[in-house]
Amino acid sequence: MINRDVYFDAVRDSMFEGSMSQQQVDGQNVIVALWDYQATGTPMTDIRWLAYILATVYHECATRMWPVTEYGSDSYLKGKPYYPYHGRGFVQLTWEENYRNAGIALGLIDDRDLVKHPDVALDSLIAARIMFRGMSEGWYTGRKLGQYFNDNEDDPVNARQIINGNDDDELIAGYHTKFLDALQGAMGRV
């Protein structure tokens, strides 16, 4: 389990210049709580995975740590070939097929059906579940967390390929290091 007080004290200084909004705290709480819940009996026991997930959210959501909608005006988004399935979430889910597949994988039906109600991907818990499954199972590019963080690999630079080629890979790897330091301290593993 991650000691939230220790974790937040560390990231507040290292990542958020001394203060965080309630939304930034809430978003991280959702992610860390889901991690704690899923870590039992699953491959998600390598804390480097969580550090990389948090680093990715920090980058993809422009430090907000909360699910976002793809940036752009309504007319811009309506011009996208995948509209109305434009980017939503902690990590941008796009295209109808991906909304459908994520919804099926997570068992989302009725008023939570992602195809009928794409804004459901902005719900913080659902966005976190999509991101965890997507990054661990290779939904975005075919690349998975386990390829970059395992007994033989520790590669936060190339892990960017899980989401988006190598754009800002060194920058995100630096975020990963800071989140990892905070998490290890919060677990008594310094």
Can you name each region flagged by the protein language model?
Residues 1-2, 190:
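N-terminal secretory targeting signals
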Residues 164-190:
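Low-complexity, Gly/Ser/Thr/Pro-rich intrinsically disordered linker/tail segments
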Residues 38-44, 139-148, 187-190:
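Surface-exposed helix-capping loop/turn segments at secondary-structure junctions
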Residues 2-29, 39, 44, 48-135:
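Peptidoglycan-targeting cell-wall enzymes and recognition modules
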Residues 57-60, 146-168:
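Acidic helix/loop microenvironments that form the catalytic cleft of cell-wall polysaccharide enzymes
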Residues 128-151, 155:
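GST-like fold's C-terminal all-alpha helical module
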Residues 33-35:
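Structured secondary-structure scaffolds
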